[in-house]
Amino acid sequence: MNENLNGILNVYKEAGWTSFDVVAKLRGILKTKKIGHGGTLDPSVTGVLPVAVGKSTRLLEYMEAAGKIYEGEVTIGFSTETEDADGEIVSKTPVERELTESEIDSVMKNFIGKIKQIPPMYSAVKINGKKLYEYARAGQTVDRPTREITIKSFVRTSPMMTDEAAGLVSFSFKVECSKGTYVRTLAVDLAEQLGYAGHMSKLQRTASNGLMIKDAVKLSEIEVAMEAGELSSLMYPAEYAVSDLPRVNLTADQFEMARVGKKFAEDDWVTDETTDSPVIKSNKSKFLLTDLSELTRDKFAAFYDDKLIAVYMKHPEKAGIWKPNKVLV
């Protein structure tokens, strides 16, 4: 077994593979069990699948929580049981009136910001210990709780394509969204607001954790690199797993505090009027520190000498206190 590998791979997931299939294949190629992916993709969806190897698997939760960017296609005129092109048609609503691009663009703006979404029946969300797709395959429908997601941007990226004979309208889109977003459901809800049944006819993840589709590599390329002893050329540092978190650069004194798991208190900070920078007033030492009271997130990645040292989080019970969520040194 090869237990010395550590880092992030930007894997291009091809159609037909589940995310677990990719992980299982990589375990064989890399000869290590310590592998995990940073966000599930449906079998028909292609694109960026961040994969953590070795000690970097400790950071999987941050990879999974990161925002994602997708590009795909919506088809209006019929819906499917799976909300994508793979499912059986369940409803047909031919587009018989003039649907304009400006109308589509206007409705897409309704989805920007925090919205509620109901997970599709064909999904891995668990209800009463059972995955929704298991209920769906048994012909059962169950109540699903809504979840709050965030849509940062949602725009049409192609002209509207019309098939008058079939009563269909299609167009490409790009969406930047939070963890837990079902883009299939977004497509269905968009069509519904336009007054029709619809589905997501294509989808590709183009970015995740700072990893871009143009740099993604196929499993076959990883296998060749491994055999040639050149895997390091494809491996990204563990820091990519936390690229979605705010970055705080530590001084030497702060590093000593972080590496032994000490907390940071916002009340310890004052402003050095000569530099207009926040400084620590505890321990009789004055050293620069990012003013964490200004951070809008509940976690931050702590770096020293350009290396990831720890991930800190707001204390759940003590206001103004930041505690280590994971110490990595």
From Swiss-Prot:
InterPro entries: PsdUridine_synth_cat_dom_sf, PsdUridine_synth_N, tRNA_psdUridine_synth_TruB, TruB_C. Its EC number is 5.4.99.25. The active site is at D42. It catalyses: uridine(55) in tRNA = pseudouridine(55) in tRNA. One of its GO terms (biological process) is tRNA pseudouridine synthesis. Transmembrane segments: none annotated. Keywords: Isomerase, tRNA processing. GO terms for molecular function: RNA binding; tRNA pseudouridine(55) synthase activity. Coiled coil: none annotated. Pfam families: TruB_C_2, TruB_N. PANTHER family: PSEUDOURIDYLATE SYNTHASE TRUB1 (PTHR13767:SF2), TRNA-PSEUDOURIDINE SYNTHASE (PTHR13767). Belongs to the pseudouridine synthase TruB family. Type 1 subfamily. Responsible for synthesis of pseudouridine from uracil-55 in the psi GC loop of transfer RNAs. This is tRNA pseudouridine synthase B. It comes from Lactococcus lactis subsp. lactis (strain IL1403) (Streptococcus lactis). The lineage of its organism: Bacteria, Bacillati, Bacillota, Bacilli, Lactobacillales. The gene is truB.
